[in-house]
Amino acid sequence: MPHFNASGILVPSIASTKKPSNSQTTRQRGWMPALVGAAVITTLLLIGGLVLAVAWPSVTNGFRRAAQSRDLQNMETIAQALNAYSDRYGTYPPPVVLDANGTPLYSWRVLILPFMGNEVLYKRFELSKPWNSPANQSLLNQMPSEFASSNSPDAAGTYETNYVLLTGPGTLFPTTGPLSRTQAEKNTILLVETNNMCSWTQPGDINIGRGLRVGQKPMVDVGGLHQGSFTAITTDEDGLRIPSDVPQAVLDALVTPDGGENVDVSTFVE
């Protein structure tokens, strides 16, 4: 009940002036570190997210370039073998080996095996028989790793290739017969990437008679393994990363061995 002193003034009760207990004070003090810790963690997460958002395009671009570099290494090995064949025999190999009746037998890839260090495998082929004859088909699983892209996971398992020649009028491989490396002007494309669809010994390249296109169709369009660009290699064994939206005139000029076009490929070079 209320308590008054001798002068009639209300005196506060003991209960109303009671200090907080030690346990209450401890709990109150314990909230502060927790709040500060939560604020610090939230800030760090926000900063980390911002850094990742800024850096991620560079990271993904690095992954893409590394993937393309692996393809270009494969293509350089193949180009070296093609050039060695040209130096030995005077021209590049025919895209398709034909029998006496004009029947397609097998691909140029079989012919360059000795120049890739695979002479033993080459000697196992029955060169008078087609690629899908029982004896030759049994060698499909001996495909050199350079013929398949690591960026096309099913290629190695199906023994299908990702690297092809460009054939047809105005190329290094016209219908009249293959040219030699000495007949090609600088920056002439020798080999390009494509989505796989044919076995490595099977005759199969991209004929540009209907026009050269960048796209996703296997063995028809150039490219398909990489986003935004495709890989190619020249007769000089220079690796190129060519944008998918390259002007058609530039693409056509890169294919022509003797067109006289002056094409700046400095931004494409590996």
PLM regions with names:
Residues 25-47:
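N-terminal Sec-pathway targeting helices
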Residues 153-156, 195-197:
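Solvent-exposed loop/turn segments at secondary-structure junctions
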Residues 5, 99, 149, 167, ...:
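Acidic surface patches and DE-rich sequence motifs
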Residues 80, 107-108, 142-144, 158-160, ...:
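Short, solvent-exposed loop/turn segments at the edges of secondary structure
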